[in-house]
Amino acid sequence: MRTFLFLFAVLFFLTPAKNAFFDEKCNKLKGTCKNNCGKNEELIALCQKSLKCCRTIQPCGSIID
């Protein structure tokens, strides 16, 4: 019975993992379509379904295209 309660508590409080593999890509596969861009991301385009194309901001010293 204790094992069941322990497993229930562990599984109940675990957050579901996000699978980024199936996310919609944009800007030549360098950005992702989201509802809102994160703190370290910039809005670069608009996606379908009123989503925003967000791309991680690169530091000034490492510009890669």
UniProtKB/Swiss-Prot annotation:
Lineage: superkingdom: Eukaryota
Q: What is this protein called?
A: Beta-defensin 106
Organism source for this protein?
Answer: Homo sapiens (Human)
The record's account of tissue expression is: Expressed specifically in epididymis and lung.
Q: Which InterPro entries match?
A: Beta_defensin_dom
Main subcellular localization, coarse class?
secreted
Q: Which GO terms describe its biological process?
A: antifungal innate immune response; defense response to Gram-negative bacterium; defense response to Gram-positive bacterium; innate immune response
Signal sequence segment: 1-20
